[in-house]
Amino acid sequence: MQQVFFQETEFLNSVIDYDHKVETENLCLDIAYGTDKNFLFGCGISIASILKYNEGSRLCFHIFTDYFGDDDRKYFDALALQYKTRIKIYLINGDRLRSLPSTKNWTHAIYFRFVIADYFINKAPKVLYLDADIICQGTIEPLINFSFPDDKVAMVVTEGQADWWEKRAHSLGVAGIAKGYFNSGFLLINTAQWAAQQVSARAIAMLNEPEIIKKITHPDQDVLNMLLADKLIFADIKYNTQFSLNYQLKESFINPVTNDTIFIHYIGPTKPWHDWAWDYPVSQAFMEAKNASPWKNTALLKPNNSNQLRYSAKHMLKKHRYLKGFSNYLFYFIEKIKH
C-alpha cells in the first residue's frame, strides 16, 4: 500500500452515491472534479457534455465539494439516471486548505485536486481531473484506453508558447519548465507515480513557504509545474483548448476552438452559464449539453457581485443592449460604493 498525504478520515465527511449503471462492469475511467458552491452548475453540465459524446463508454464521475444543496441532489441524481451512469459526491472538510494562497477568482477549492489525486491512490491506476468549466465535444476513448509508462506522473496540455515557458522557467526557478508549462485544469494522473513522488505532500509544503509564495502567480498550477517538470506526457491541445469569453469584448481575437477540439476550457471570470455570455457561438457547446441534461429548463446565472456586474455591463454594451448595459454599470457602481 502506498502512502497517502490526505487521509480520508481527515477530509471526508460523507459520500452520496448516485449509481444508475446498468452494467456490472467495475472497470471504468474515473473522472473527478473539485468544486465549491459556485461551480456546481457548470460541473453538472460538464458531466452531461462528456456523457452526451461518450454514451456507452465506461465512465464513473466523482465530485469533491464542500457544499451540496437539495437542488443539487435532485439534479445530479437525475443526470445519473438519464445517462445510466454513476456519480459520487464527496462532501469534504476543506478547512486545512483555507490557509493556502487564494484570490477573489481562485478559492481554496483549487487545492481539491490534491485531495482527489490522493483519494484514488491504491483505488485506481489513473484518474482524470477536470476543472468544472470544461465542456466536452468529442470522444475521450483514447484517454480511457491510455496506459502510463512507469516514470510519468501525469498527462497534461501546455499553454502558451516556448517564450512563455522560458519566462515561467526563469520566474519559478525550474529549468525543466522550459520544455512546457501546463494548465492544471486537465490532469490525467498516474496515481502510483503521484504517490511515489509524494506530490501532494511536497506541494502543500511548498505552498506554505514564503519564498515560494513570492514566486507563484497561479498557486496550484505553478507548484505542480515546479514539481512535475520532466515527469510529464504532453497531450494535444484539443484536450484543453482554453478560451476566455471576455475575448469577445475585443475588436478582434483568435478563437482556438475547432471541430477537432475535445475539451473547451472556458477560462476567465465570465462563464457560459452566465446570462450575459450564453449566446456567443463558442458558448453553444455548453448550451447544447445543458439542453441534453436535467438542467435544460434551469435559468442561467445573473451577476451577483461587482466584478460580474461590470463584465455583464461590458458584454451587454458590446451586443448593443444599451439599457441592460448601462443599468448593470449603475448597479456595479452602487456595489462598489457599498463595499
Swiss-Prot record:
What SUPFAM superfamilies is this protein classified in?
Nucleotide-diphospho-sugar transferases
UniProt free text on domains: Contains two DXD motifs that may play a crucial role in the catalytic function.
Q: Where is this motif: DXD 2?
A: 220-222
Encoding gene per record? waaO
Catalyzed reaction equations: UDP-glucose + lipopolysaccharide = UDP + alpha-D-glucosyl-lipopolysaccharide; alpha-D-Gal-(1->6)-alpha-D-Glc-(1->3)-[L-alpha-D-Hep-(1->7)]-4-O-PO3(2-)-L-alpha-D-Hep-(1->3)-4-O-PO3(2-)-L-alpha-D-Hep-(1->5)-[alpha-Kdo-(2->4)]-alpha-Kdo-(2->6)-lipid A + UDP-alpha-D-glucose = alpha-D-Glc-(1->3)-[alpha-D-Gal-(1->6)]-alpha-D-Glc-(1->3)-[L-alpha-D-Hep-(1->7)]-4-O-PO3(2-)-L-alpha-D-Hep-(1->3)-4-O-PO3(2-)-L-alpha-D-Hep-(1->5)-[alpha-Kdo-(2->4)]-alpha-Kdo-(2->6)-lipid A + UDP + H(+)
Q: Which Gene3D superfamilies match?
A: Spore Coat Polysaccharide Biosynthesis Protein SpsA, Chain A (3.90.550.10)
Q: Which PANTHER family match?
A: GLYCOSYLTRANSFERASE 8 DOMAIN-CONTAINING PROTEIN, LIPOPOLYSACCHARIDE 1,3-GALACTOSYLTRANSFERASE
Q: Does the keyword Metal-binding apply?
A: yes
Q: Where is this motif: DXD 1?
A: 131-133
Q: What happens when the gene is disrupted?
A: LPS of the mutant contains one galactose and one glucose unit.
Any idea which positions bind UDP? 34-39, 131-132, 265-271
What is known to happen upon mutating residue 239 to A? Answer: Does not affect transferase activity. Can complement a deletion mutant
> Which positions in this protein are listed as binding Mg(2+)?
131, 133, 265
Q: Which family does it belong to?
A: Belongs to the glycosyltransferase 8 family.
Question: Its annotated pathway?
Answer: Bacterial outer membrane biogenesis; LPS core biosynthesis
Gene Ontology MF term list: lipopolysaccharide 3-alpha-galactosyltransferase activity; lipopolysaccharide glucosyltransferase II activity; metal ion binding
Species assigned in the record: Escherichia coli (strain K12)
| Mutation effect (residue 270 to A) | Does not affect transferase activity. Can complement a deletion mutant
Cite the InterPro entries for this sequence: Glyco_trans_8 (IPR002495), Glyco_transf_8N (IPR013645), Glycosyltrans_8_dom-fam (IPR050748), Nucleotide-diphossugar_trans (IPR029044)
Protein name (database record): Lipopolysaccharide glucosyltransferase WaaO
Q: Record's Pfam families?
A: Glyco_transf_8, Glyco_transf_8C
